[in-house]
Amino acid sequence: MDPRARIEAFLAGYAAAHAEVKPLFDNKEKGTSLAAFDAWREKLREIDVAHRNGEFYRQYALSFGSSPDFSPDTVEIEKIEVYGNMARARLARDSRAYGGPIIEMMLVHVGDDWRIETIDDYDEEPSSPLVDKDVLEAWKAAADKTEPMEAQHKEDMPDPAAVFSASWACEALNEDYFEVFLSDTLEWREEDGDRNDPETYAAVRARAIAEMYRNAEVGPVEIQEIGQFPHGSYLAAGDPFGEMCLCALKVEPGVARAQALLTTLGGERCVAALRVILADREPVQWKHAIVMTASARSTDVSSWHEVDTRSGNGTIADADAYFGMTHRQYSRVGRQVERAFLMDPGSGPIGASTYSGRQYGVAQAYWGLDEDDRPVQLVLDHQELWAPADPPEATTGA
């Protein structure tokens, strides 16, 4: 098949598969069953075998809409450009179908046939940047007027460098955990005095929290070297599948070395933190990083003290390179999902990314400063680990 015939066959096959499985999802009395999704996954596998170059069925297997994402009735081929053994097709999707209005398909010539290599949806022009240059410059101007750091919060990892150099560390316990379980550990002793006295209560509460940390799970610490990437005066941090923020603090341009902090808690292996080392000097103090938040098209920017990591992933990257990526390059980066990897949109590494921490929601970012208050490290903490600890054997044997 030529590229156009392959795409037309894919659209027809996808719509037919959707129509065949749809009755399984329409049985509202019994609700959607696992069998319905199993059948849908099997159909998507068949579509992969028939039309695509590799296994991509998982891209659409976790959802099922009332109308197909791809159909000759709702998707129109606008143009196809052939470059030797590769072809790029642009398709338009009307509003009746789920997904972005712009679709790009990359096809590859395999033997005597053309196969679909990738499919990407876009809400904006694929060649447009994630953030327009004038908007990014407005963010930088706002950052320059913002206090870029503040004292560490009480829930912050006290010394990230110590945890990165440890063999074992105890898990972090958030404030919600304290409030739920504090009543079980808030032991009043005769010598404590009046429990209605605020200072007495604060002291007993601090003792109870310390006891909870002593009993917290201890996990092994492993460092994974990710690699190096060049950076300019500003770094970006956050969630590559959610909100990436501009760090307010300016840094000396250079080459950063990235590391992932891995651990195992509750039997689950995860990324606890991501660190970039900006200079060989050791940090002697840590401060909470302030980031600038705004929508991609807005110059109305505000400062904030937390980083939204809703997908559980974390990234630290050169701000100009990251926000300057086109939507097409961003889609390419989105397919590079590994435990820890250098983010490369095709022009070389621009940052480091990890997948994923267990804490879905909020991460903390810290600057490590040298004796002259110059930034030498930036850590994105998923709030998994708190501080170095003795190995479990030593704890239980004491």
Which residue ranges define each predicted feature?
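N-terminal domain-onset segments
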Residues: 143-398
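Short aromatic-glycine motifs in intrinsically disordered, low-complexity regions
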Residues: 62-66, 103, 107-110, 352-357
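Short, compact, well-ordered microdomains
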Residues: 95, 99-121, 360-385
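Low-complexity, intrinsically disordered terminal/linker segments enriched in charged
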Residues: 3, 7, 11, 79-86, ...
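Short, exposed beta-strand/loop patches in secreted or surface proteins that constitute
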Residues: 76-82, 107, 342, 367-368
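Surface-exposed, charged secondary-structure patches
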Residues: 35-98
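A broad structural signal for short, well-ordered beta-strand segments within beta-sheet-rich domains
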Residues: 72, 77, 116, 271, ...
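Core segments of small alpha/beta cavity-forming domains
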Residues: 1-62
